[in-house]
C-alpha cells in the first residue's frame, strides 16, 4: 500500500526533487525561445501523472491482449476522435511514443528496405528522420534530397524533376528549421504523378495547422505524422493521421510492428491537449504565436541580423549570425547567460560544423504561452541583439538579465 501523505517525491527522492525544482525555476526565470519547446497545461500534466501509467493495454480499443482495459479504451478512443476532428482526418493513431517513432512506423508500414525516399535536405532545414545517413531512414533506404532555391524557399521545380528522375516510393514534406508555408498540394500532385506515397511531417506546425493559421496537409497526404508537444502544446509523444487506404498498414506497423504496450497516461495527456486545441482560445493563441514570430523577425532584421528566407510565415525563424561575426554555439551560450534560451542551428549550406553552426533557431510558442504579445516580442528581440552586439560586455549581460527577470515576473508560466 502507498501512503500519499508520507510517500511524497520529496520524501522518497530528495535529489530528483531538487533537480525538478531547479528546472521549474529555470523555466519560470528564463525566456524560452527553442522552437520545439512549449509549456503544457496543468490539466495535461495531471493526466500524465495519473494511475493510467499502471495499465498495460497492448492492441487497440476493443481489441486488447490484456483484460481490464475498458476504461483506458475510453481514453484512447477520445484521443483518436479528437485528433480526427482537430485535423479533419479519416483515421488517427495516438500510440506513437515520439515523432521519430511515428515516422519509423510509416516507413515500416509502407516501404521495403532499399526503396527510394525523398525528403528535404538536413543541411537546408530537413529533419534527421527524413533520410540523414546516420539515421535509420538513411541506412535502410535510398535517399534523394531536395533543397532550397536562391530565395531560400523550397525548390519545388527541382523537387519535381528529382521525383520524375528517381521515382521514389515515398515523398516527404516537412522540416525542423523552415519558416515559410509549404505548398502541400504541389507535393501531392508530384507524388501522384510518379506513383509515390505522400507523407507530411508536420511536427513543427501542428498547432498552427489545428488553428487554421498554416496550411493543412491532411486533405493532400496519404499519411501525416507529428509530435504532440511543440506548437500543439501537449505531452511529449507522437501522432499519425492517415487515409483509409493505408490505415491498416500503419496501425499494424505501430503495433505489433515497432511498439508493444502504449503509454496510456501519455495518451490521456494527448486527449486533453486535443480537447484544449479544439477551443476558440487555442486559435487566438496560435494567431499570436505567428504575430510574435513576425515581430521578432522584423526587429532582428532592423538590428542588422539576417533572417533565413527573409521572413517567417510560422512560429520559427533561422537567424544567420555571420553579419555579427559570431557562431551559433557562441550565441547560444551568451544568450543562455542572459537567461534567454535558444539553440544553435545550421543555416542552409552552413560552412561551420554541426556542433558550431553559423546560426540560431528561434521560436515563439513558449513565449506566447506566457502571455507575450508583440510588445514583449519586440523587446525580447532587441535584448537578443543587444547581447550579440556586445558579446564581451558584462554590463550589457547584467542589464539584459535584469530585464528578462522583470519580464518573466510580469508573465509567469504557471500562477
Swiss-Prot record:
Pathway the protein takes part in: One-carbon metabolism; tetrahydrofolate interconversion; Amino-acid biosynthesis; glycine biosynthesis; glycine from L-serine: step 1/1
Cofactor(s) for this UniProt protein: pyridoxal 5'-phosphate
Compartment(s) where it occurs, according to its Swiss-Prot or TrEMBL record: Cytoplasm
Residues with the N6-(pyridoxal phosphate)lysine modification: 230
Family: Belongs to the SHMT family.
Site (described: Plays an important role in substrate specificity): 229
Catalytic activity: (6R)-5,10-methylene-5,6,7,8-tetrahydrofolate + glycine + H2O = (6S)-5,6,7,8-tetrahydrofolate + L-serine
Protein name: Serine hydroxymethyltransferase
Cellular component, GO, one term: cytosol
Enzyme Commission number: 2.1.2.1
One Pfam family, short name: SHMT
SUPFAM superfamilies: PLP-dependent transferases
Record text on subunit structure and interactions: Homodimer.
Described purpose of this protein according to its UniProt entry: Catalyzes the reversible interconversion of serine and glycine with tetrahydrofolate (THF) serving as the one-carbon carrier. This reaction serves as the major source of one-carbon groups required for the biosynthesis of purines, thymidylate, methionine, and other important biomolecules. Also exhibits THF-independent aldolase activity toward beta-hydroxyamino acids, producing glycine and aldehydes, via a retro-aldol mechanism.
GO-annotated biological processes: glycine biosynthetic process from serine; tetrahydrofolate interconversion
PROSITE patterns: SHMT
Keywords: Amino-acid biosynthesis, Cytoplasm, One-carbon metabolism, Pyridoxal phosphate, Transferase
This protein's record includes keyword tRNA processing: no
Record: residues binding (6S)-5,6,7,8-tetrahydrofolate: 122, 126-128
Organism domain of life: Bacteria
InterPro entries to which the protein is assigned, alphabetical: PyrdxlP-dep_Trfase (IPR015424), PyrdxlP-dep_Trfase_major (IPR015421), PyrdxlP-dep_Trfase_small (IPR015422), Ser_HO-MeTrfase (IPR001085), Ser_HO-MeTrfase-like (IPR049943), Ser_HO-MeTrfase_PLP_BS (IPR019798), SHMT-like_dom (IPR039429)
GO terms, molecular function: glycine hydroxymethyltransferase activity; pyridoxal phosphate binding
Amino acid at each position: 500500500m502507498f501512503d500519499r501523505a508520507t510517500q511524497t517525491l520529496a520524501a522518497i527522492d530528495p535529489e530528483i526533487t531538487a533537480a525538478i525544482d531547479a528546472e521549474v525555476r529555470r523555466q519560470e526565470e528564463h525566456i524560452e525561445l527553442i522552437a520545439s519547446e512549449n509549456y503544457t497545461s496543468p490539466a495535461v500534466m495531471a493526466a500524465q501523472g495519473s494511475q493510467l501509467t499502471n495499465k498495460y493495454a497492448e492492441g487497440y480499443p476493443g481489441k486488447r491482449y490484456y483484460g481490464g482495459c475498458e476504461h483506458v479504451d475510453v481514453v484512447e478512443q477520445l484521443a483518436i476522435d479528437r485528433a480526427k476532428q482537430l485535423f479533419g482526418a479519416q483515421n488517427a493513431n495516438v500510440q506513437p511514443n515520439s515523432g521519430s517513432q511515428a515516422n519509423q512506423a510509416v516507413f515500416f508500414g509502407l516501404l521495403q528496405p532499399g526503396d527510394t525516399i525523398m525528403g528535404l535536405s538536413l543541411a537546408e532545414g530537413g529533419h534527421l528522420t527524413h533520410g540523414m545517413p546516420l539515421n535509420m531512414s538513411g541506412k535502410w533506404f535510398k535517399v534523394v534530397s531536395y533543397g532550397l532555391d536562391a530565395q531560400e524557399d523550397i525548390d519545388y521545380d527541382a523537387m519535381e524533376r528529382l521525383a520524375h528522375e528517381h521515382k521514389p516510393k515515398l515523398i516527404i514534406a516537412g522540416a525542423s528549421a523552415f519558416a515559410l508555408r509549404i505548398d502541400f498540394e504541389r507535393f501531392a500532385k508530384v507524388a501522384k504523378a510518379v506513383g509515390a506515397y505522400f507523407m507530411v511531417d508536420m511536427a513543427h506546425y501542428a498547432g498552427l495547422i489545428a488553428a487554421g493559421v498554416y496550411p493543412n496537409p491532411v486533405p493532400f497526404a496519404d499519411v501525416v505524422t507529428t509530435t504532440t508537444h511543440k506548437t500543439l502544446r501537449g505531452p511529449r509523444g507522437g501522432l499519425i493521421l492517415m487515409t483509409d487506404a493505408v490505415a491498416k498498414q500503419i496501425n499494424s506497423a505501430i503495433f505489433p510492428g515497432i511498439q508493444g504496450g502504449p503509454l496510456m497516461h501519455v495518451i490521456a495527456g494527448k486527449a486533453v491537449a486535443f480537447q484544449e486545441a479544439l477551443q476558440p482560445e487555442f486559435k487566438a493563441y496560435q494567431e499570436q504565436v505567428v504575430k510574435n514570430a513576425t515581430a521578432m523577425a522584423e526587429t532582428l532584421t532592423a538590428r542588422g541580423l539576417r533572417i533565413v528566407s527573409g521572413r517567417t510565415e510560422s512560429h520559427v525563424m533561422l537567424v544567420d549570425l555571420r553579419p555579427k561575426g559570431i557562431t551559433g554555439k557562441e550565441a547560444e551560450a551568451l544568450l543562455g547567460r542572459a537567461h534567454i534560451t535558444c539553440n544553435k542551428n545550421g543555416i542552409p549550406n552552413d560552412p561551420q560544423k554541426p556542433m558550431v553552426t553559423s546560426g540560431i533557431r528561434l521560436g515563439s510558442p513558449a513565449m506566447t504561452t506566457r502571455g507575450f504579445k508583440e510588445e514583449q516580442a519586440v523587446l525580447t528581440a532587441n535584448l537578443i541583439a543587444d547581447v550579440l552586439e556586445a558579446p564581451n560586455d558584462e554590463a550589457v549581460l547584467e542589464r539584459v538579465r535584469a530585464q528578462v527577470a522583470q519580464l518573466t515576473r510580469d508573465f509567469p508560466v504557471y500562477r
